[in-house]
Amino acid sequence: MATVLDTPVAVRRAAMDLLARREHGRAELSRKLRQRGASPELIDPALDRLAEEGLLDESRYLESFIASRARGGHGPLRIREELAQRGLPRADIERALNACDIDWSAQLREVWRRKFARLPLDAREKAQQGRFLAYRGYSMESISRLLSGRSDD
């Protein structure tokens, strides 16, 4: 049975339920509430109040999202694009990526080691490994350095 989101209390409760599961960005939370039938006139004040109370925090969401995706083996390029698709400002994304203490080179080597564990023997293997790592969100420069055997250790 779907809850009707036609009062400020109902919208706030639905927003808090979503935030209890995981961090959300303002744009994502607004979209989810609209999908559940809440009107923008009710959503904006509810989200403003949650932000004032510290329950909705974009920087905390960015930090959580970046850490989660990095643990999953994704690189900074893919994470940056996913966050932009979720409606977050590019400047905030860049600030969060620069502030995180993730060693992207070590992350790249670990992702590569888990998947392939050996340098490519021919051009076809090198292309295959490169495509996989590029899809994961690592720069071509870092990938090229790794696959040619030059490490920045």
UniProtKB/Swiss-Prot annotation:
InterPro entries: RecX_HTH_1st, RecX_HTH_2nd, RecX_HTH_3rd, Regulatory_RecX, WH-like_DNA-bd_sf. Keywords: Cytoplasm. One of its GO terms (biological process) is regulation of DNA repair. It is found in: Cytoplasm. Belongs to the RecX family. GO terms for cellular component: cytoplasm. Its main location: cytoplasm. It comes from the Bacteria. Pfam families: RecX_HTH1, RecX_HTH2, RecX_HTH3. Modulates RecA activity. This is Regulatory protein RecX. The keyword Cytoplasm applies. It comes from Pseudomonas paraeruginosa (strain DSM 24068 / PA7) (Pseudomonas aeruginosa (strain PA7)).
